[in-house]
Amino acid sequence: MAFDKKLLEIVACPVCKGKLEFNKEAQQLICKADKLAYPINDGIPVLLENKAEPLAE
């Protein structure tokens, strides 16, 4: 199942409530403010802070 980009209009980072960006290659939602990457599993974003990976500097 593919990620529906329309979700970007309604989802937010659970930490800072900021905008998320879709990284198609890595299948992640990125929060640039918190430098976190949230996984997308089977088209479903996993917006849990403990599942996020820190972005490389």
From Swiss-Prot:
Classification via InterPro entries: Trm112-like
Cellular component terms per the entry's GO annotation: cytosol
Highest taxon listed in the record's lineage: Bacteria
Family membership: Belongs to the UPF0434 family.
Protein name: UPF0434 protein Spea_1772
